[in-house]
Structure formats: C-alpha cells, structure tokens
C-alpha cells in the first residue's frame, strides 16, 4: 500500500509504504517499508487538501492560501548499507538484494503555484457571532476537479470565507486562476454534483455552514457568474418552542428522485450531517425543509465529518464522494465527534458500531472511504490507520509523528516479501511437483488419444 499523509506540525506530506498487518505500536509486528517527508513548509503552511491528478502529478492546497501543482517521479529504492548476518560477516550485494523487498519510492517537485486565495478579513466580523471559542481563520474546504472525469484540468478550490476559485492547469503545466467568485460565509463544506451528465455549460454544487443554510448553486462554463437555484429552510421549533440552530457540516448527493416528478421543480436529493448530530435528508421535489431529520446521538454531541458507503459492500460512491443510488435504503454513514469516536450508522440513523473504539486515542481529523473497501483514518494521536469497511478490523497502523490532516491512498498493492532459503526451496519443490503432475497428465491424455485413434483405424479396416 502506498499512502500520502498531510502532516500538520511540519507542513509536509509523508509517503508511507506498507503491507496489511503493519503496526508500528507493536515491536514484533510488521513495520512499514518506507516513511519519508517531502515538501515541508512548516506549521503555518500545512496541506489542507490534496487531489491526485495522475500517477505523476498532484495538486495541493495549503493553509497559507496557496495551491501548488506537484510533479511526482518514482525510482527504485537503493540499499544504502550492507546487512550483517549473525556471524558478523557482511552479505554480498547480490545476497542483500535477494533478502530485501524491492519497491519504488517517490520524489516530489513543485512546478507551479497560485497564492493569495484567502480572505481572513471577511471572517473577522463573523467571529463574534460564532459559538466557536476560537477566532475564525480561513482555510480550504474543497479541492477537486469541476468535472467527474479525473483527467480534467480545471479545479475548484473553495475556502471558509466563501471564496470560490476556479484554477486551471495549462498546457505548459502552469496553474492559472480563471476566476474568483463569492459565496455567503462561513462555509464548512462545498460539494459538487457528479451523478449524471448535466448540461456541459452548467455545474451544480451545494454549500453551507454555521447559521448558513444549505444552498444549491449553478455556475456557467465561463465561470464568470453563479446563481443560487435553491435554499433549504430550517425545521420547525423544538418541543420547547426554541429555534433549532443551523450548522450543516457535510453533505452527499444521491441520484434524482425516481417516478413521477413535478414539472418546474428541481430534482435533487441529498443527505447531510449537522454539527448537532442530526442526519437530515432532502429532496427538492418534496420542498425546502428536510423530509427526515434523525437524531444520531442522544445528547447531541457535535459531529464533524461525513463519509458514505454501501451496506452491501459494493463500491457505489462517485469520484467526488456522492452516493450512486436513488434511495437511502442501502446508505451507510460514517461520522466523527470531537473526542475519539468514529461512528457507523445505517440510513435510518441506527448506530452500527464504533470503528477503532479500543485503539483510537485522539480526535479524528480525517476519515475517507477508499474504493468501498477501506476506511482511512488519522487524527491527533499521530497514527494513520486503515480499517476494513465491512468488519471494522484494523489492517494498518503507522505512526507518522505529527497531527494528520489529510490522507490519500495511491494504491493498495502489497509489496512482495523476499523468501528465506528454506521457503525458497519449499516453493521450488512445490513448483516442480506441479510441473511433474501436469506432464504426467499430458502424457496420459496423449496415450488415451492414441488408443482412440488406433481403435477408429482398426474399425475402418474391418469395414
């Protein structure tokens, strides 16, 4: 497995190469083959968001307001020193190369960047109104291609202050800022819609935040203007006739509502997680209020993130994280609180369990479901973990020495381990045995075919 991990304390990204079963907290367990930092720029410039464009290119968004294009090159890891066997004799180079696993490691080079993408002044006036105890600071909430085609060279970079930047990678491999548009702040999330082929000259996305109701926005292909096409409405007052606070934290689209639809009304469906531990479900055909609001936690403990996956174990999540289904029947949700819990819920809000409940010791600052198979998790306890999405079993645990902000899995290919001399001999013996059995089978079939041919020939001669 090859991972890229955003490390907050050093402002670097670390490349981690490991196999299933790796656990750095256990001395006798399998250890990672390679952990190395790259592009360190310090605490004030850590990587907020990453998007891998291809095997040799990625785009990074840092909390200093900079978006960078990074070239990735790979080369075979060189053995820096000879191993010494228990007798104290140095192994020769051929023996060393046979005993160590072989794998490629990456080098990273910044080839282009765009800066000054934040507006902290816009958040200053909102800090006094926020229930947060700390000053609001700008940061990136989204970095992704504007089309669902992963090879697309035009990206959306959205910030907490409500700035929506359209950035393009030119033919000369340089980043160009095409446009900057404004949204209502503060923004906790911005989610693009990619579940069906819409008009090529329009793009749809949803956004929201603290006291900022969910809105659907349409942007044209020229990126010069945007239009709000729908806005949610708050639910009715609670049983004490108190206003329910608004704070959507994350959202995922579903496919359009099936069956009969009312003409003239938009047809979008989505589910959202709120700060106050509600799972809300919307259909624009139904109206502006959610058609379902479910309390996920009894004491309304704050939730911060949202990932979705299919209850049947199939990969039905789009490139941008939306759920490729018309209903919530098979929808499962993963969310995190600000303590140490990673919760799994079904589409009706029933808790299915906690992931890593006996191992995670700090708040999870990042979770992501990869290919419908793995849950990537990292946080304040400085460990990268990979869990099996079905069984919740921990597959990988690697200490990276820093708070974690983002994780990307480049591949899940296992690195082949070299065999000991006895294992090699056993493997060769088994290989010879299989070859002998195949040769014996071929010889037997040839004899049978020869007898059949001779029998047919004798019958013809008698006739």
From Swiss-Prot:
SUPFAM superfamilies: WD40 repeat-like (SSF50978)
Localization: Nucleus, Nucleolus
Protein origin, superkingdom: Eukaryota
Keyword hit for Nucleus: yes
Gene Ontology CC, one term: preribosome, large subunit precursor
InterPro entries: WD40_repeat_dom_sf (IPR036322), WDR74/Nsa1 (IPR037379)
Protein's UniProt keywords contain Transferase: no
Keywords: Nucleus, Ribosome biogenesis, rRNA processing
Gene Ontology terms: biological process: ribosomal large subunit biogenesis; rRNA processing
Subunit structure: Component of the pre-66S ribosomal particle. Interacts with NOP7, RRP1 and RRP5.
Protein family per UniProt: Belongs to the NSA1 family.
Function: Involved in the biogenesis of the 60S ribosomal subunit.
UniProt protein name: Ribosome biogenesis protein NSA1
Organism this protein belongs to: Saccharomyces cerevisiae (strain YJM789)
């Amino acid at each position: 497995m090859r991972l890229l991990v955003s490390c907050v304390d050093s402002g670097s990204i670390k490349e981690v190469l490991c196999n299933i079963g790796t656990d750095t907290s256990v001395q006798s367990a399998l250890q990672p083959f390679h952990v190395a930092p790259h592009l360190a720029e310090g605490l004030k410039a850590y990587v907020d968001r990453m998007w891998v464009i291809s095997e040799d290119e990625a785009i990074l968004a840092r909390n200093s307001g900079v978006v960078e294009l990074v070239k990735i090159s790979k080369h075979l890891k060189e053995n820096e020193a000879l191993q010494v066997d228990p007798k104290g004799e140095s192994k020769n180079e051929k023996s060393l190369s046979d005993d160590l696993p072989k794998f490629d490691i990456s080098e990273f080079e910044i080839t282009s960047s765009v800066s000054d993408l934040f507006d902290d002044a816009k958040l200053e006036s909102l800090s006094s109104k926020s229930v947060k105890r700390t000053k609001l600071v700008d940061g990136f909430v989204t970095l992704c291609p504007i089309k669902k085609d992963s090879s697309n060279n035009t990206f959306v970079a959205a910030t907490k202050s409500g700035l929506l930047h359209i950035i393009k990678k030119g033919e000369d491999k340089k980043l160009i800022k095409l446009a900057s548009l404004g949204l209502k702040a503060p923004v906790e999330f911005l989610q693009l819609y990619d579940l069906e082929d819409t008009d090529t000259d329009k793009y749809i996305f949803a956004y929201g935040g603290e006291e900022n109701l969910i809105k659907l926005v349409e942007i044209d292909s020229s990126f010069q203007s945007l239009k709000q096409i729908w806005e949610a409405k708050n639910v009715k007052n609670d049983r004490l006739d108190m206003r329910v606070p608004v704070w959507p934290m994350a959202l995922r689209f579903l496919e359009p509502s099936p069956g009969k639809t009312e003409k003239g009304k938009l047809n979008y469906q989505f589910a959202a997680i709120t700060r106050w531990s509600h799972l809300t479900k919307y259909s624009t055909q139904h109206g502006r209020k959610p058609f379902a609001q479910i309390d996920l936690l009894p004491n309304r403990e704050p939730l911060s993130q949202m990932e979705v996956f299919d209850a049947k174990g199939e990969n039905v999540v789009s490139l941008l994280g939306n759920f490729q289904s018309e209903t919530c029947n098979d929808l499962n949700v993963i969310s995190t609180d600000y303590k140490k819990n990673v919760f799994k819920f079904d589409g009706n809000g029933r808790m299915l369990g906690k992931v890593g409940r006996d191992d995670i010791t700090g708040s999870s600052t990042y979770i992501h479901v990869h290919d419908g198979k793995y849950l990537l998790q990292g946080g304040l306890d400085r460990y990268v973990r990979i869990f099996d999405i079905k069984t919740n079993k921990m597959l990988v645990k690697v200490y990276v020495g820093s708070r974690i902000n983002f994780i990307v899995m480049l591949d899940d290919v296992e690195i082949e381990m070299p065999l000991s001399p006895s294992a090699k001999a056993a493997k060769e013996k088994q290989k010879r045995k299989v070859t002998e059995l195949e040769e014996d089978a071929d010889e037997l079939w040839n004899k049978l075919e020869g007898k059949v041919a001779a029998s047919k020939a004798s019958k013809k001669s008698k006739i």
